Amino acid sequence: MKAQGETEESEKLSKMSSLLERLHAKFNQNRPWSETIKLVRQVMEKRVVMSSGGHQHLVSCLETLQKALKVTSLPAMTDRLESIARQNGLGSHLSASGTECYITSDMFYVEVQLDPAGQLCDVKVAHHGENPVSCLELVQQLREKNFDEFSKHLKGLVNLYNLPGDNKLKTKMYLALQSLEQDLSKMAIMYWKATNAGPLDKILHGSVGYLTPRSGGHLMNLKYYVSPSDLLDDKTASPIILHENNVSRSLGMNASVTIEGTSAMYKLPIAPLIMGSHPVDNKWTPSFSSITSANSVDLPACFFLKFPQPIPVSRAFVQKLQNCTGIPLFETQPTYAPLYELITQFELSKDPDPIPLNHNMRFYAALPGQQHCYFLNKDAPLPDGRSLQGTLISKITFQHPGRVPLILNLIRHQVAYNTLIGSCVKRTILKEDSPGLLQFEVCPLSESRFSVSFQHPVNDSLVCVVMDVQDSTHVSCKLYKGLSDALICTDDFIAKVVQRCMSIPVTMRAIRRKAETIQADTPALSLIAETVEDMVKKNLPPASSPGYGMTTGSNPMSGTTTPTNTFPGGPITTLFNMSMSIKDRHESVGHGEDFSKVSQNPILTSLLQITGNGGSTIGSSPTPPHHTPPPVSSMAGNTKNHPMLMNLLKDNPAQDFSTLYGSSPLERQNSSSGSPRMEICSGSNKTKKKESSRLPPEKPKHQTEDDFQRELFSMDVDSQNPIFDVNMTADTLDTPHITPAPSQCSTPTTYPQPVPHPQPSIQRMVRLSSSDSIGPDVTDILSDIAEEASKLPSTSDDCPAIGTPLRDSSSSGHSQSTLFDSDVFQTNNNENPYTDPADLIADAAGSPSSDSPTNHFFHDGVDFNPDLSNSQSQSGFGEEYFDESSQSGDNDDFKGFASQALNTLGVPMLGGDNGETKFKGNNQADTVDFSIISVAGKALAPADLMEHHSGSQGSLLTTGDLGKEKTQKRVKEGNGTSNSTLSGPGLDSKPGKRSRTPSNDGKSKDKPPKRKKADTEGKSPSHSSSNRPFTPPTSTGGSKSPGSSGRSQTPPGVATPPIPKITIQIPKGTVMVGKPSSHSQYTSSGSVSSSGSKSHHSHSSSSSSSSASTSRKMKSSKSEGSSSSKLSSSMYSSQGSSGSSQSKNSSQSGGKPGSSPITKHGLSSGSSSTKMKPQGKPSSLMNPSLSKPNISPSHSRPPGGSDKLASPMKPVPGTPPSSKAKSPISSGSGGSHMSGTSSSSGMKSSSGLGSSGSLSQKTPPSSNSCTASSSSFSSSGSSMSSSQNQHGSSKGKSPSRNKKPSLTAVIDKLKHGVVTSGPGGEDPLDGQMGVSTNSSSHPMSSKHNMSGGEFQGKREKSDKDKSKVSTSGSSVDSSKKTSESKNVGSTGVAKIIISKHDGGSPSIKAKVTLQKPGESSGEGLRPQMASSKNYGSPLISGSTPKHERGSPSHSKSPAYTPQNLDSESESGSSIAEKSYQNSPSSDDGIRPLPEYSTEKHKKHKKEKKKVKDKDRDRDRDKDRDKKKSHSIKPESWSKSPISSDQSLSMTSNTILSADRPSRLSPDFMIGEEDDDLMDVALIGN
């Protein structure tokens, strides 16, 4: 072992020694030092290369050192540039001189030119294949030594080419991006050249926003939105004025334009597509060349709009974007979260504060003098039951430059919504128990609407402001408050504030301060509100009463708290309900003037309390919504029955609230208490300018919002602005309290309904009457009403001439004008296509939705308005509602109200202004204009409804064409028509007023739905109400619901509160209803109003007005679809019986609302008929027809109108806009509501009916009775059409049936009116279709019936439709029921006196038998009504005479249930006849009418009077017979061609509505009726 170890040791040593030897040998050689240094350098360089790739931490440290060094020399600058290039993965090198540094990549290079001192000379960028171009932005950054920004530019250039494919493909993609940028730049220049817009306008409205071209590495930037808070300096809080040179890239919301690779292939243009330098339209759309293989290439890339921060958008918005671009927004399904939660995160991310805020969706805002707490209810259910969901988007794909403007508009809309919601999100921390901390709940209602609920600043109640972001610059606002709540502010005011600040906290503070100001300025308001509330409480119908049932409408009030939660339907439903109830509320507020007087007059107070019973119903419907009794109705009722009261009320003209709040239309709006009109989203502009700016321009932006916008406009303009009045009814805080009380009470509720349904469209109505009245008009209106009551003429007075109504805009005239202004109507109605005023009126009537709210209100009113019913003489319900507000005997009380109602109607309520004479004077020429300006007023005036012959009916008809259209519009708009109708009828002496009230229109609008409901419910007003909680038409509800209507109708279940005995005994001799006459007329009118509320009710009303027989018929109708029908009949009847005698008949017929459907509805009708006859030949003609057809059409009409209406609007049974839309359909489709209205101011709903009615009128007086029932609704002019319509209905053709030359003559006279009605009649736009619409109406009725079933949901959603559908709905119900109870309708005895004592069954004092079972059977034909549509058409078209002739046949047909369908058709005919009858009115309704209108009108008046007297007797007999045979089969009724058929038809409709088994009337009935109608009309003449 030892030897071995030694050996190893020796080996090691030897190795070591050999190694050392070798080392010595190697290094012993002398090497130069230079070689050693070289070796060291090599090693060092290798280390640097290795470190750059492998030691990032070391590199970052070196870069930090570089940044810390000051660049003061050329080497330092080049070193820094090379360092930046390395950071971005780019190469760099210096030029030989060392003064140029090149930063390079495969696709581009940047050349930085320096001087020897290191100072920057220039920076150029050269893209692949291009010459270098100097970049000022890069020069600026480097001169300022801003190397970070320079580095960002380099990064941007790199990302620009971060595309798939080789360099050649990348070059094509760059060319595509360049061509896109060139096109967008051209679009920006085109916009600027066309508008010379400044930076802010470019940002908010520019087709491509504010465009900043691509520069260096910054992509092309489109600045598309900036909020008011963005324009405030963060440090000084002073506003920033934008100039071309101070718009920073970071300001506001921006999107960059780029191109990115995609997995799919897209055809992208590689050359500019814009040809020329001028846009091809007013939207600055350029002319693009088509995509071809020459100018485009398929690339695996696409254009993108990219956002710096992901934007929260709703699920619906994502779908809209994808529909716009045609390209999926996300490659994979995105995750959705509550939108409000995303908006909250987005807002909080703007603050650099890293500390998370534990907000739990509750945020605090500290404002000067106020502290707010906002709870964002992110999980609130929408109508579809789901919460509002959203997601984040960071980029949007598109292929064509033409898509960019569309995309930007969508994004602006979403961002504006986000901005409002985000304005509540603040990091402010406050203690929950802080004293004076105000609580607000923000609840989503849809992707563009939300509600802010808070406690009323003065009262202990909940208030809700619904904001609808129509687009980025228009926000429409509706304030919903209790009927008796103190004024807060107007919708216009709120909208102006919102649009100015786009901040909810700032807006809430402004609202509170405004409310405090108003309270300080109007100390009497609270007293008035209390008085009204007490009165209402004393007289409120049972909660189950129709009015309450209508709480659907009331829901809005409760909905106010949380529109979404209040209504089962969902936030939107609630919203709509809210609007309805608000409108109702408005009406109640409308009593403001009265209340004000009350507060000042202890005697007045006591009187009101004594009589409050009748009036209280009006407010009740709205009240339920806000659980606030409708003070207004009681007032109306009280004043109606007390001349002293009237005088007291009218003595206060000086105190006009208009004057009080005149300066602030907004306040006036609010006053209406329905301030949160359903038009909720109508006027988006409201907020921007608090008071000065006129929102009308902005309003127009959205049709749904149109209503709202109009409201805004009127508010801005001031009480005088009709639009404002119309739209602002709900918003009109001031006026509603005062004058609008009756009007508002009665009709406004109806309007809200349409608005809620908007369909937006809303949009809009509630405001109409309330708002109008609210203005200074209130006092005038009240005084006028008193005067008018004393000298019936005053009714027409309100809207003597276009000028007058304008003058009285704030009061009723203006309101009406405004209301019926195309604008206004458009606002409410999506489709306000009526070129003809008649169409507008029809629309107004056809806006039952709008009226529906009124109806809701009326519903209540009707329920507790049996007395009113008597006063009204026609429909216990609708009329009562209306009456209560405008007509019930409280002429004084509702002086303002009546005027307002008239305004709504379009009839100048300020009869005092025009007086009968004035009305007359304006009748012809003014009529047309008036009609346009004030549907009701105009129609009334032209018809000389003042004359009272067809008075309200005739005027309605006259208005019917033009006026009706307006009325319709109005009704739609402000629900004022309904109000008006009441008012008009209430004024009674105001045929014009009646016309104005075209309660048919308004009511029709509301009523039909109600009717539908009522029909569906059959007899339970309450049910009816509840059926459409949201927008139960007051009128319709009222008619149906109240004992009178409902009672009368088979559905006693309506369980209406006992309706005081309403004995409308109007001296026959009085053509012009004096005060008493006026009362009855007003009563009639009220009925009409009610009717107007409901489509078919409207018809019924008209009928009542038309003749006693109509009234009776109405009764029958009532039995059938009594609830709604009655109202309708009554209402129209009262309108029809503008003349004293008519009024009387109306009164009589109204006398026993409860007695029988007819009694309630028909009574009025009968009286109307009689009155109408006195009117004169045309009047007579029209009236008789009217009186009979009115009722029947009224009843049948809703279905018909609905149907037809439904055509255009019908499709929208669930579509509020459509239904409510003032489309020709609406108006022409009078059958639906609109049809009738179209023909005549009030004819809208009775258009179809009118037609039938027309025939009826023409037929013998006895026939007349029936006809009146069906035609009354339409009025004389309408009647012609109606007959024709009826005929058409039975035949299924409108024009085919021209039975008599005499009828033709009548039709010719009415033609214009008819024509007007016609277009309305035709759902679409055709005037002729008016009758047609009726036909359609029938189908509609079935549809409406469905509506009835779906009513609540649909109601909201189709408030407008509802107007139509309402009409239709009633009609539908009617239709269904009509078919079932057609007989009932056909044999009805119209009792002028409806004495229904507290639940007692109505007794008929004066009976007129509606002898046309055929009429009833006509209902059975209702399905034919669709065909009948044609007859409706004639009404509308110039060929009306022919159609009208046919109409007579139809009149016979009236018995034929189609009249329900006919309802519309009849309505049209009726309207035509009405127009004819009330030439002036007709003129109103129809411009052409004016030619023959004046002389014929006078003649009509006289002849009509005679005919009326005859008819009255006849009607009484018929009524008796009818009473006997109310339930009798239609056949017996059919025996009486005119009266029976038409009346039956109408009645039948009504009856059907009442759930009476429908009897199918043979077609032949139509023929007989036509003949009879013709005879009556001729004889009457």
Curated annotation (Swiss-Prot):
GO molecular function: DNA binding; nuclear retinoic acid receptor binding; nuclear thyroid hormone receptor binding; nuclear vitamin D receptor binding; transcription coregulator activity
Chain positions covered by the region annotation Interaction with VDR: 542-788
Motif LXXLL motif 2 location, chain numbering: 645-649
Motif Integrase domain-binding motif (IBM) in this chain: 874-901
Motif annotated as LXXLL motif 1, chain positions: 604-608
Pfam families: Med1 (PF10744)
Start and end residues of each stretch annotated as Interaction with the Mediator complex: 108-212, 215-390
Keyword Amino-acid biosynthesis belongs to the record: no
Cellular-component GO terms for this entry: mediator complex
Ranges of Pro residues composition bias in the record: 622-632
Biased composition (Low complexity): 1033-1050, 1077-1093, 1100-1111, 1119-1156, 1218-1227, 1234-1293
Biased composition (Basic residues): 1496-1505
Sequence positions bearing Phosphoserine: 588, 664, 794, 886, 952, 1156, 1207, 1223, 1302, 1347, 1403, 1433, 1463, 1465, 1479, 1481-1482
Biased composition (Polar residues): 655-675, 807-819, 1162-1195, 1330-1345, 1425-1440, 1448-1482, 1533-1552
Ranges where the record places region Interaction with PPARGC1A and THRA: 622-701
Predominant location: nucleus
Keywords, alphabetical: Acetylation, Activator, DNA-binding, Nucleus, Phosphoprotein, Transcription, Transcription regulation
Residue list for modification N6-acetyllysine: 1177, 1529
Region feature (Interaction with GATA1): 681-715
Subcellular localization(s) per the UniProt record: Nucleus
Function: Component of the Mediator complex, a coactivator involved in the regulated transcription of nearly all RNA polymerase II-dependent genes. Mediator functions as a bridge to convey information from gene-specific regulatory proteins to the basal RNA polymerase II transcription machinery. Mediator is recruited to promoters by direct interactions with regulatory proteins and serves as a scaffold for the assembly of a functional preinitiation complex with RNA polymerase II and the general transcription factors.
Subunit structure: Component of the Mediator complex, which is composed of MED1, MED4, MED6, MED7, MED8, MED9, MED10, MED11, MED12, MED13, MED13L, MED14, MED15, MED16, MED17, MED18, MED19, MED20, MED21, MED22, MED23, MED24, MED25, MED26, MED27, MED29, MED30, MED31, CCNC, CDK8 and CDC2L6/CDK11. The MED12, MED13, CCNC and CDK8 subunits form a distinct module termed the CDK8 module. Mediator containing the CDK8 module is less active than Mediator lacking this module in supporting transcriptional activation.
Similarity-based family: Belongs to the Mediator complex subunit 1 family.
Name by which UniProt lists this protein: Mediator of RNA polymerase II transcription subunit 1
Gene: MED1
